[in-house]
A protein has these predicted regions:
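Flavin (FAD/FMN)-binding glycine-rich loop and adjacent Rossmann-like elements that form
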Residues: 1-266
Length: 269
C-alpha cells in the first residue's frame, strides 16, 4: 500500500505493487453501464477494498508489525457520515472521451509532435494503472501499467477540446477531451484540468462575443493572450504568488514555453 500523509491525522491510500487496492479488470463495463449496474460495480469495489484491509489487519499469516500498523487506522469519522464514512463515488480515472478535431497522443507528450494552437499545457507522467490480469503459461500476469516520466511540459491543442464541426458548434470539453489512452493518462490531473477549465471558459466567451457561438472559429492564440493578461493583471501579488513563489514563477514559465512551442510549430507548418 502507498500512504500519503494529509492534514488532520489523515492519509491518502493508493495502490502499489502487483496485488493491492486496485480491483484489476473489474471496471471495464462501467462506462456503458446503467446506474443500477454502476451501483453494483461500486459495491464490488467497496467489498474488495474492505476485504483486503480486513485480511491484512486480522489474518495471522500477515506479519504482526503490519497488522499492528493497520490497526491504528479507520474510516474518517467526520466524512460521509450518511454512508458509513466511505465515499459513495468511485474514483474514475478514465472513461469515455470525445473524438475531436485532433487527438492528443503519446507523441505530443514526449515532444515529438508539437501543436500550433495550445489552449493550455500538461506535464504529468504518462500514467496508467494495470487494466487486466491474465494467466499466461500457468503464471498470473498484470497488464497495462504505464509509468513514463515526461521531461518537459507540452501543449494541449484547442482542437482536442472542441468537436468536429459537423457534430456540434457550441461545445467545449476540457475534461473528457480528445486524447489517446496514453496521452489522457498524463493530461487527466486536477491542476491541468484547472488550466484547461479556465482557458476553455475564456474560449466560450470569445465564441459568444465574436463568432456567434461557434467554438471552431475561435483563435486559440487570442484566448491564450487573454489568459496570460488576466492572470498577470488580476493576481500579480495574490495569495499563491506570495506563499508559493516557486510555483507561481513556474506557472508563467510554462505559459511562456507554451507560446514559444506554438510559435515554432506554426513556423514549421
Amino acid at each position: 500500500l502507498k500512504w500519503s500523509k494529509m492534514p488532520n491525522s489523515k492519509c491518502d491510500m493508493n495502490n502499489q505493487g502487483a496485488f493491492s487496492t486496485d480491483m484489476i479488470g473489474y471496471s471495464w463495463s462501467y462506462p456503458e453501464a446503467s446506474y443500477a449496474e454502476r451501483e453494483r460495480i461500486y459495491k464490488e469495489h467497496l467489498d474488495y477494498t474492505k476485504g483486503l484491509l480486513y485480511f491484512m489487519w486480522t489474518d495471522e499469516r500477515i506479519p504482526a508489525s503490519i497488522r499492528a500498523d493497520l490497526a491504528k487506522w479507520g474510516w474518517p469519522r467526520d466524512e460521509y457520515e450518511d454512508n458509513g464514512h466511505i465515499t459513495p463515488q468511485l474514483y474514475v480515472r478514465e472513461s469515455r472521451r470525445m473524438v475531436g478535431r485532433m487527438v492528443m497522443t503519446q507523441a505530443h507528450c514526449t515532444g515529438e509532435s508539437v501543436v500550433s494552437d495550445p489552449i493550455g499545457w500538461a506535464d504529468y507522467t504518462m500514467d496508467s494503472h494495470n487494466c487486466g490480469r491474465y494467466v499466461v503459461n500457468g503464471m498470473v500476469k498484470n497488464e497495462g501499467d504505464v509509468q513514463i516520466y515526461i521531461k518537459n511540459p507540452y501543449n494541449v491543442s484547442y482542437r482536442a477540446v472542441t468537436p468536429q464541426a459537423g457534430e456540434a458548434r457550441n461545445l467545449i470539453v476540457p475534461v473528457c477531451l480528445s486524447a489517446s489512452h496514453i496521452a489522457f493518462g498524463s493530461i487527466r490531473m486536477e491542476p491541468i484540468y484547472m488550466v484547461l477549465g479556465e482557458t476553455c471558459g475564456l474560449a466560450a466567451v470569445e465564441a459568444i462575443d465574436k463568432h456567434a457561438g461557434c467554438v471552431q472559429d475561435v483563435d486559440a492564440g487570442v484566448v491564450m493572450s487573454r489568459f496570460a493578461e488576466r492572470d498577470r493583471t488580476e493576481n500579480p501579488t495574490g495569495d499563491t504568488a506570495s506563499r508559493c513563489p516557486d510555483i507561481y514563477d513556474n506557472y508563467f514559465a510554462n505559459l511562456q514555453r507554451a507560446k514559444d512551442l506554438a510559435t515554432g510549430a506554426r513556423q514549421a507548418e
